[in-house]
């Protein structure tokens, strides 16, 4: 049985002694939705119509889908729904950034809209909390609760689009880029992140260029090696340290997949990817007198000498009880200059939304069950969240 058929069988199976649960059509890619319509005895092209209604027009009410006959609309209402996360809290920054706390079940995740002169980027979460325990990141301090479903991931894009007027309202810049850089490690939720990204790329849905959809990872190497077999999108690596000793400390997944192992995997991805222009983005948070010295810049240049890349230097954004300080502008500028002398393209990222805790590393959300991280430690050892990915 093919993956789509297996998925549909799972979605359509109902226990005889339990009420039927409606299928959330946002959990389905267009191909899976075509299988769904076949199961209903309908023509598969109806899926194309539904996907357009949901994502092109932002419609979640079957009755408003005027090119679908009433009989089919009634059938759909009986077995399916279109449901995206609702906004629990909205905060607007003085710089135009908007942060939403999106309600997903009993928990919340955070989604950030960042408008700029030539683009508008949406930062999307992939998990409730995060299990990787990066010491400089607010989300990691909240612990891990669960993976988000496809509908909870793509639903963030849908809800944000609905709010900002991405469905044809003039005067508002639409979402041009999506970055999987919100709460969570995307490569620990590949089963749901990849289908959500497929919907982002689908011309019947959002039709984003694969160069405008970016997946950021701290380095789950087996999943990264598999990613190119599933989808081609832009790649960003959360490196943050130029040597294993330091990275073991601040990005604990490095204890399982060290820098060389990670960079080798990145190079393999670049060799087969068309989405990256032959270059990967390296993310490097600047921590005062921790990883921002001249010696660190030289070490980083050595690590990346055979990897075509653009380096983003990220001024660290503080959160309560964090054991770090933000690097001074002088130290950041000196770090940048040193790397540029090696010929690297190095950009100092402008901090956006820090007045509403929407900046990089500040997303925390409302993680209710904080015991999951402890359970993962017991199951997988101290290398939290570095389980094998088949």
From Swiss-Prot:
Record SUPFAM superfamilies: Radical SAM enzymes
Annotated PROSITE patterns: RADICAL_SAM (PS51918)
Catalysed reaction equations from the record: adenosine(2503) in 23S rRNA + 2 reduced [2Fe-2S]-[ferredoxin] + 2 S-adenosyl-L-methionine = 2-methyladenosine(2503) in 23S rRNA + 5'-deoxyadenosine + L-methionine + 2 oxidized [2Fe-2S]-[ferredoxin] + S-adenosyl-L-homocysteine; adenosine(37) in tRNA + 2 reduced [2Fe-2S]-[ferredoxin] + 2 S-adenosyl-L-methionine = 2-methyladenosine(37) in tRNA + 5'-deoxyadenosine + L-methionine + 2 oxidized [2Fe-2S]-[ferredoxin] + S-adenosyl-L-homocysteine
Active-site residue numbers: 110, 360
Cysteine-cysteine disulfides: 123-360
Protein localization: Cytoplasm
EC number: 2.1.1.192
Main location per the UniProt record: cytoplasm
Binding-site residues, S-adenosyl-L-methionine: 184-185, 216, 238-240, 317
Record keywords, A-Z: 4Fe-4S, Cytoplasm, Disulfide bond, Iron, Iron-sulfur, Metal-binding, Methyltransferase, rRNA processing, S-adenosyl-L-methionine, Transferase, tRNA processing
Domain Radical SAM core as annotated: residue spans: 116-355
Positions with a binding annotation for [4Fe-4S] cluster: 130, 134, 137
Names of the cofactor(s): [4Fe-4S] cluster
Family: Belongs to the radical SAM superfamily. RlmN family.
Protein name: Dual-specificity RNA methyltransferase RlmN
Organism: Haemophilus influenzae (strain 86-028NP)
